[in-house]
């Protein structure tokens, strides 16, 4: 097994645990997914659609979390289509659900490997991959039903 294979196994295992932690089920709406994460983690969350994102560059969303207050907010671009901003928010939900949380540095991107950015460590890269896997699973849960497919026609 290669190192990349080992990373992928760890990422999938963490994503499975994270997804199970929230007890997400098919047919949920995005708001229900957010509430399920709140219940699972015993926190309060807000998803904020930010109007002024001129300084964000390629950033599609970010998470702020205050452990002492058990509350956080996920910020996404208001200009993005709902399906896109929900995916960005789902990525941030993935960070919350992951048992090895990311460091939250803004320069960390799931599309950048530790080989391309020496400041990004393998554990940080894995945390980004876990969040992406969770976001994709949430998207499948939300958008693969006939109800959603028909509403996009």
Predicted region positions:
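Metalloprotease/metallohydrolase-associated module, dominated by Zn2+-dependent proteases
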Residues: 2-39, 103-153
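Short, surface-exposed loop/turn motifs that are enriched in glycine and acidic residues
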Residues: 19-27, 78-83, 87
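Peri-catalytic and regulatory segments of divalent metal-dependent proteins
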Residues: 25-44, 56-68
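Active-site scaffold of zinc-dependent metalloenzymes
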Residues: 46-86, 93, 99, 104-105
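Short amphipathic C-terminal alpha-helix that caps PH/PH-like domains
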Residues: 90-93, 135
């Amino acid at each position: 097994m290669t190192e990349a294979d080992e990373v992928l196994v760890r990422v999938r295992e963490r994503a499975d645990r994270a997804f199970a932690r929230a007890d997400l089920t098919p047919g949920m709406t995005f708001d229900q997914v957010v509430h399920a994460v709140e219940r699972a983690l015993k926190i309060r969350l807000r998803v904020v659609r930010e109007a002024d994102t001129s300084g964000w560059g390629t950033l599609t969303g970010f998470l702020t979390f205050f452990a002492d207050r058990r509350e956080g907010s996920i910020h996404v671009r208001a200009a993005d289509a709902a399906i896109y901003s929900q995916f960005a928010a789902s990525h941030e939900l993935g960070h919350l659900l992951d048992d090895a949380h990311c460091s939250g540095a803004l320069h960390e991107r799931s599309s950048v490997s530790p080989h391309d950015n020496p400041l990004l460590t393998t554990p940080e890269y894995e945390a980004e991959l876990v969040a992406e896997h969770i976001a994709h699973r949430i998207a499948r849960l939300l958008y693969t039903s006939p109800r959603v497919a028909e509403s996009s026609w």
